[in-house]
């Protein structure tokens, strides 16, 4: 029913963050614990049109969204090597969102009954993704049985005063070309 038009939509993961690292000193005593989670997803809507028998063009628009949370814990010890009651934790959270676009063209021609030539090009203009940022510092107790972090005292850093509450991530423009021969 669409004739020479085509359309598509979808939701796909774009990036993913997931790590848990620990750092020890020369005596193999835990000093730092690092954790990251989250990622960027994209929901997209695309459309294409067949200009001629061998030539098609298309465009898609994407909304990129998600969040990334990075947590760092610094462990303190007394002179006898015992872990202090309170540890320091920093949590950085970035909530992300922004639009991006792609345009493309594809040409194909049947050279022989079992040989087709295909060439394509795409262009993605530069785009910006807004990041709304938060930073929190806490004194925490870590339950030795469950490893659960229990905040005792927390403070949110005023990133607005530093001009960092909202920042921009820049996606560079991208041009790609390709061609191939196949059956």
Regions found by a protein language model. Give the residues of each.
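Outer-membrane beta-barrel porins/channels
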Residues: 2-183
């Amino acid at each position: 029913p669409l004739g020479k038009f085509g359309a598509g939509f979808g939701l796909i993961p774009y990036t993913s963050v997931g790590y848990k690292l620990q750092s020890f000193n020369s005596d193999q005593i835990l000093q730092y614990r690092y954790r990251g989670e989250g990622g960027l997803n994209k929901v997209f809507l695309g459309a294409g049109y067949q200009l001629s028998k061998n030539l098609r063009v298309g465009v898609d628009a994407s909304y990129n969204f998600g969040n990334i949370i990075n947590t760092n814990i610094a462990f303190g010890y007394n002179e006898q090597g015992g872990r202090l009651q309170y540890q320091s934790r920093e949590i950085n959270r970035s909530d992300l969102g922004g639009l991006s676009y792609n345009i493309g063209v594809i040409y194909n021609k049947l050279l022989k009954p079992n040989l087709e030539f295909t060439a394509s090009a795409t262009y993605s203009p530069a785009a910006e993704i807004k990041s709304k940022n938060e930073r929190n510092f806490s004194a925490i107790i870590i339950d030795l049985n469950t490893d659960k972090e229990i905040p005792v005292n927390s403070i949110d850093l005023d990133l607005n005063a530093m001009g960092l509450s909202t920042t921009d991530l820049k996606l560079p423009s991208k041009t790609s070309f390709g061609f191939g021969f196949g059956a």
